[in-house]
Amino acid sequence: MMIGLYLFLNLAVLWIVARASAANGLRLALMLLLAGFVVGSANSLIEALFFHVLRARDLVAAALPAAIVFAVLAPIAVLIAGRWRRGAAASDAGRGGFTPLTLLGVIAAYELLYWSAGTLVFPYIAHFYEARSLPPVYEVAAVQIVRSLVFVGAVYPLLRNGLRSAPIVLALVYSIIGGVAPLLPDNPYMPPDIRFYHGIEVTVSNFIFGLVVGWLFAWRPRRPVAAQA
């Protein structure tokens, strides 16, 4: 049942992204595959490896099922969204972008959300990590810089090609594909109670992070209007 819900949630969000995107066809399917796999699996595996929840030799076995799932779901989402053939482009196609300042904002937002959510949930999951040697705080913070930029990179092609309502769409991508969905099925690495609390943690924080990323992509500082003589 949880596998079915996992597949349904991922397909539903990919369909929403496909409907909001200005791209179409195979190009759109590949962008959905990239976003789905990286957000829904690869970026989480980075942290699982870092916290010794997963061993390096288990990475391929852990990543392969998600790669297959998104390779199948991505073209299906494009097809049922009616975007396999050329359609109307999104009205905000090509607008927006990131600057060094906005990327710093992305990193700062992710760090703030990560540590805030983690601090609130840690008392409920501390027993799971007692037997593991946790890395120093500065190393954890450094890894989150990388992960925040990986999150952005995964959806950047979609943003550059035009994505209507980008903040809310990214909030759904990060919170469902990268939050609640992958924690639904049983897995040999994390027991149900730990997945439950982590699910609350990442779903809420990732939703807010998606709003921030979408807003910062479109944000431009206002230029002063020259006074007329």
Which functions belong to the PLM regions below?
Residues M1-A229:
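Juxtamembrane/disordered regions of integral membrane proteins
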